[in-house]
Amino acid sequence: MADRILVARIGAPHGVRGEVRLFVFTEDPGAVLDYDPLTDATGKKRFRIAALRAAKDHFVARIEGIADRTAAEALTNLDLFVPREALPPPDDDDTFYHADLIGLDVVDEAGVVIGKVVALQDFGAGDILEYAPTLPATKAKTLMVPFSKDAVPVVDVPGRRVVVAEAFVERRPAEPEEGEDTGGE
């Protein structure tokens, strides 16, 4: 499991005084202020949020030491993390941090491993499970399925696997044998 958990991402600058858009991933967005300091992915660079206010679909934050737009631009798309031990433990087996899914086996309903989880994406219409397929006939580098009970009926973090419903498994038909009639001209 990851020792640092992604809690926010810095977006584009907001104005000319060093404020930034902040996309918060905690269940309670205001809780991001409770985690001090936040760090980059390496854990070496530290950031403190001096002020936070809600905007339309994000937050606007002032980060200590960032006083102008140029400094704010340098932080665009920076992920902010906290140590796992700073967060409350999940309540039960059905509760987990998204980071806990990275690296889990993706299996079909028959239990055949079809890939490994590489990310959980949110493009605005709900979470999407992204995985790197291991099936030899699959040419895509990654595949995506909705992260819903219909598409992913089982999430077994202790068992290190997620199950993808058959309707969402991409399988390419085998290549036709040489000379086999494929119905084409």
UniProtKB/Swiss-Prot annotation:
Query: Where does it reside?
Result: Cytoplasm
Which SUPFAM superfamilies does the UniProt record give?
PRC-barrel domain, Translation proteins
Q: Which GO terms describe its molecular function?
A: ribosome binding
- Predominant subcellular localization, coarse grouping: cytoplasm
Which top-level group of life is the source organism from? Bacteria
GO BP, one example?
Answer: rRNA processing
Per the record, its GO cellular-component terms are: cytoplasm; ribosome
The record's InterPro entries line, in alphabetical order, gives: PRC_barrel-like_sf, PRC_RimM, RimM, RimM_N, RimM_N_sf, Transl_B-barrel_sf
Question: PRC barrel domain spans which residues?
Answer: 92-168
Q: Which UniProt keywords apply?
A: Chaperone, Cytoplasm, Ribosome biogenesis, rRNA processing
Q: Keyword Chaperone, does the record have it?
A: yes
Q: Does the keyword rRNA processing apply?
A: yes
Self-association and partners: Binds ribosomal protein uS19.
Q: What is known of its domains?
A: The PRC barrel domain binds ribosomal protein uS19.
The record's PANTHER family line, in alphabetical order, gives: RIBOSOME MATURATION FACTOR RIMM
Entry similarity comment: Belongs to the RimM family.
Q: What NCBIfam families is this protein classified in?
A: 16S_RimM
Function recorded in the entry: An accessory protein needed during the final step in the assembly of 30S ribosomal subunit, possibly for assembly of the head region. Essential for efficient processing of 16S rRNA. May be needed both before and after RbfA during the maturation of 16S rRNA. It has affinity for free ribosomal 30S subunits but not for 70S ribosomes.
UniProt-recorded name of the protein: Ribosome maturation factor RimM
Organism whose genome encodes this protein: Xanthobacter autotrophicus (strain ATCC BAA-1158 / Py2)
Q: What is the lineage of its organism?
A: Bacteria, Pseudomonadati, Pseudomonadota, Alphaproteobacteria, Hyphomicrobiales
